[in-house]
């Protein structure tokens, strides 16, 4: 649901600023690269402007070559807010259009925008985007035309003043992560359409003149889809938050202008398969392989969401005739789609045939992947920890430099209550401190917040969500309890975040005092080790040093996690004690929503999920908080799954069926409410796509059906809210998932 008020914009210092900044930074882009960039040149319609535009307009819709190196006369167009000043001036300080320009100039990026005519009130703006269909120049041009029509359809509230803008030019830049080059499409209105490549050296070339132009567009399309999916998946723990506020995030599954996006991605996968490692891999993977990279992660996520298992299975089995390791991807898909019998059978077949199946240089790496999948299944689904331990140990032997096998082995020792071995294995995990999750980063720096145009989407109003004042929230953040705000464990990243989660599972079993005893029994601290070394050099009796020699040196990062755990436990205990006292006195808890949020996150990190959920509920009872809502939604989904599992357990006869039904109904209502509110909040901040919301709502839809869920929302919320949820969530299940998994 894109409207004028749902498009964030940044005012440029001069027209072409954002494109030029992007061109300068092309050599710095790594792996998946930046978000797509959209730039606009807007002007105030006057008779002189209209004549100027018409006199330079070309053949509308024609496809032209890349900007030539011998362009037209030099001019610089700078931004202006006033409606009564023509502000085009000649200069060489900014966006240059010169007869003697080289490929490295800004001109090829800016592409001579009516250089000989002064347009009144002209202003350059830009914003970032994700999820746009980049399968070809036509689909991009259709999207750009939609954006320009939205901008010009009615007067725009521009920094407090209503202005009627026309769009002279609109451009789209997207990163082809496989070739490390930028793909540009520029639409002149009225006039021509240009599409060209700009490589890391600043050289530009027309795409259509290349023999491999179809492959280039296929790579560009896949790059865009992978970015959209991985942005959400990699930041799921952080609530899919991203700090680049001037970004319009669309649903890549429903943004297709010509073809079905999920089907197209699956069909193109074999063509791009061998290039997958060039995209990089999640933060916990050290050695990127054909089956362990962002491309594969995206395919698995797409099939899981759309339930396109049959199409993916046919494609992967065909691919496996020449690339046997591709079966590993199919096993991953079977596991996430609850086809566990098929997955385990395939895993067994591949492991039993060994090198006959996978005859590659990375045989041990692929074997380790299979063993990890098998061990994870035994731990999570079968609770066969003894067998899981043997398999995880074999996975470590196959890939000793990978984090995941060590992590699984440590996890299975925790399940076996073998705390000493769990800690020793955790201490041995190969950490990756420099590898980060995929996040969006600003390509064109903001020189001032005054250049940000962040309209409030007024097409959807849900008072408790959309009326929230960001300044009030910031004030609340500043006055929150410093003890909660400064908890360093909340800032843990990458593999350290996973290691901390294991440590909290251990302390739940042992308690803090016993954990310290385990630590002192098996580890020697770094300062203790240094002191013992100096003692030996001074001739201290070696027999006194024997106990130290039997211990392992505790890694500094693990020692730091112990300290962070102590801080979390201390704060949690203090807050719990205070709450119990207040409850006993029948007094109200005088806490801020932000404080409830921080306490809930602390409790969640420590594995106290019911207490965390209660804290999030307390916070939401005072005002809306997107983080509280997301974490409470996660709890409701997990609690619903727990109840479902309990129904099928031998102890289920102790629970009255009516009680089970009532609990499931209560959780379903909470899930629907939270999904709707988070969807409205996302729309407020220009985000129309969320994997976590699709995942959460799918659980309810599978039981209730699409029509009933839609009716539930319709009965509780205004029509505009229903329309938003329909477009952003429900239409996905209706139009994209057409294989009967989600009945109406």
Which ranges hold each PLM region?
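Non-TPR docking regions that flank or precede TPR/alpha-solenoid scaffolds in eukaryotic proteins
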Residues: 1-744
